[in-house]
Regions:
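Glycine-rich anion-binding loop/nest that anchors nucleotide
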Residues: 3-9, 219-225, 283-368, 380-386
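An N-terminal structural lobe/cap that precedes and organizes the functional/catalytic core
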Residues: 1-34
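Extended, H/D-rich, highly charged conserved domains that either
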Residues: 51, 55-295
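Conserved small/polar residues in nucleotide/adenosyl-binding loops
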Residues: 425-434
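Short, charged/polar "capping" segments at the starts of alpha-helices
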Residues: 229-231, 388-396
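Conserved phosphoryl-transfer catalytic core
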Residues: 27-52
Length: 438
């Protein structure tokens, strides 16, 4: 079995604008335009040389219903506000949604603790917020402001932690739906004639069927992306796409906020002791969203097949060796059994292949990557863009499988992991960090 694992670097290698900052830049332009009456009165945009402006022009003046939906999703969206004012985005045009969301959620979670270590209930009034953005946004609801109002005989306003949590969650779902519109109505309609040699070699192979005739066998694909890039460039239209597992969901234009199944969340940050007890913010976590949104998990079946095959191999090997050790018949038969056992001892199990392309091996996907890589009958090839990217992938892999396991699997007779440079490198040097994001 061949399994191809793809992250956002796969889409970037096909010159598609799928970085978070690409999307955020689009939203920023969209908001600026719809909030400028003079432009709307013109009936068209004057400058549409950049494809993103060409799309915005088409969206505003030709797709009014979709435009209205997008406006409702991004206008006054607390996450859009937070990302746009983020210093990293403002100074370097770079942002990691998942990391930033995690910072906000963890700060709010921590704010619920009293000085004595006890945690307040979600239904209780918010006292203070440590995140600078949230503190500024909800400053009039803090305990200090309520006290100040009371001193002037005013009535201080209050808000509960639950109300803040729910606003963050609802606006996250709106953000995800807005991203879905961007990907399906813009990115997936972008012309893309770039096909990667490395992927072409992996996608399909000629095998003999039960009737002896040659057939084309397509590899399994585990996609961490929301887009259909792999399907439209590497699969024939008549091919059934049941070999693709969209682990983080798949973008579809005519979805809604309610039935969208795209996963955009955070990794577990609580200790083992706390994570099963404190579930106030569980809806923001990736594992929860995968279950709740019923995204793909076909890879589980692939892993099970791989492990069952290895178990069967070991059992058969043990059976042959035990038979040789226990045989008490004539010398010729005993010799034959021992020769067979000797041959079996050195025999290797049939290997399956996992190819990882455009994925940073970030620890947020640790559980999935471990299931694929940590099998004795799996050979993993990790593609890298340059030596800097390779170095980062090695560092991330240590966090996923551990230093000792990585050393064992990258050298000697037990080698099952190798790093391989990509054959296709149209990305410019300054884009390599963005290539890492999955």
């Amino acid at each position: 079995m061949n399994i191809l694992v793809i992250g956002n670097g796969f889409d970037l290698a096909h010159k598609l604008p799928t970085r978070y900052n690409d999307f955020l830049g689009f939203v920023e332009r969209f908001l600026n335009i719809i909030n400028t009456p003079q432009i709307l009165q013109q009936g068209e945009l004057k400058n549409t040389e950049k494809t993103v402006y060409k799309y915005i022009d088409h969206l505003i003046f030709n797709e009014q219903q979709l435009c209205k939906e997008l406006e409702q999703l991004v206008k006054d969206n607390i996450w859009i506000e937070y990302f746009l004012q983020n210093p990293m985005y403002q100074k370097e045009n770079w942002i990691d949604f998942e990391n930033e969301i995690s910072k906000v959620i963890q700060s709010l979670d921590q704010d619920m603790f009293f000085k004595d270590g006890e945690k307040s209930e979600l239904s209780e009034k918010m006292q203070n917020l440590s995140n600078p953005f949230l503190h500024k946004k909800y400053s009039k609801y803090t305990a200090a402001m309520r006290t100040a109002s009371a001193l002037t005989h005013g009535k201080g306003e209050s808000i509960t932690y639950k109300e803040i949590r729910d606003r963050l969650y609802n606006d996250l779902n709106k953000l995800i739906r807005a991203l879905e519109i961007y990907l399906t109505d813009y990115v997936e309609k972008e012309e893309c004639n770039c096909v990667l040699p490395d992927i072409q070699e992996i996608v399909k192979e000629n095998v003999k069927g039960a009737d002896g005739e040659e057939q084309i066998k397509y590899c399994k694909v585990l996609s961490f992306n929301y887009t259909n890039t792999y399907e439209r460039l590497y699969l024939d239209k008549q091919q059934i796409q049941n070999s693709i597992d969209y682990i983080h969901g798949k973008a579809k234009l005519f979805n809604t906020v309610e039935n969208n199944n795209m996963v955009l969340g955070i990794d577990e940050y609580l200790t083992d002791e706390r994570k099963d007890r404190e579930t106030e913010f569980i809806a923001f976590k990736k594992f929860y969203q995968r279950i709740y949104k019923e995204t793909g998990c076909k890879y589980k079946d692939w892993v099970e097949t791989i492990r069952e095959e290895y178990d069967d191999f070991l059992q058969e090997k043990e059976r042959i060796i035990n038979r040789a050790n226990e045989y008490v018949g004539n010398d010729v038969q005993r010799m034959m059994h021992r020769l067979q056992a000797s041959a079996v001892r050195d025999q290797k199990c049939k290997m399956h292949n996992v190819y990882i392309f455009g994925h940073s091996l970030d620890i947020t996907d640790k559980d999935i990557l471990r299931e694929l890589i940590l099998n004795e009958n799996v050979y993993t090839t990790i593609f890298y863009l340059n030596r800097d990217v390779m170095g980062q992938q090695i560092a991330n892999l240590v966090k996923i499988i551990g230093q000792d396991e990585l050393i064992r699997r990258t050298g000697g007779k037990s080698k099952t992991i190798e790093f391989k440079p990509v054959s296709y490198t149209h990305l410019r040097p300054h884009e390599t960090d963005q290539y890492l994001v999955c």
